[in-house]
Amino acid sequence: RVPPRQRDEARALFARAAAHVAPGGIVAAAMANDEGARSGEADFRKIFGHAQVMSKCHCRVFWASTSAETFDPALLADWQALDAPRAIGDGRYVSRPGLFAWNRVDPASALLVAHLPTQLCGRVADLGAGYGYLACEALRRCAGITAIDLYEAEARALQPARINLDSTLQQLDRPLET
């Protein structure tokens, strides 16, 4: 997987690779220079303790062999925790770094919620659910909704979306069909 631009997500990915590769194994990453390759390489060096680098055609490849002696266990644990869902905004929602608009409500979603009809009912779908903001707001505004199907290309978004839906349902004291 190519390291993402979002720094906390990239650090968590480097930590996951460091934790899963066998001693003596090699971890490699490639990033475009205009996609954060310099900071990606610096973070890679921090977690692995060293790196070899090749830069060509506006890209950078960096790799390192692994050894227990080069890892800082505290840093490894800290960076692994960066991918965990965390409270955002006023604390009503949880999300995780790297998701679209992960720590805010994006303007398009805010516009949709502002114009959401209150008479929605039955089974509804949230296409591109992200961390579940629209689904939760639909539940708050539309008492007739009996089921919600979440569709999201980023699998990492489903855990916070489910947490947010469960929390909203608990606040509203109502169940959904499964």
Label each region the model flagged:
Residues 32-47:
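Conserved class I S-adenosyl-L-methionine
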Residues 24-32:
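Conserved beta-strand signature within the Rossmann-like core of class I S-adenosyl-L-methionine
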Residues 1-8:
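A short SAM/SAH-binding and catalytic strip from SAM-dependent methyltransferases
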Residues 11-23:
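A short glycine-rich, Lys/Arg-flanked "PGG" loop and its adjoining helix->strand segment in the class I
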Residues 107-178:
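Conserved SAM/SAH cofactor-binding pocket of Class I
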Residues 17-18, 44, 138:
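Class I S-adenosylmethionine-dependent transferase superfamily signal
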Residues 57-121:
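SAM-dependent Rossmann-like transferase core, predominantly class I methyltransferases
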Residues 23-25, 145-146:
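A short helix->loop->beta-strand "cap" motif at the edges of active sites that frequently abuts
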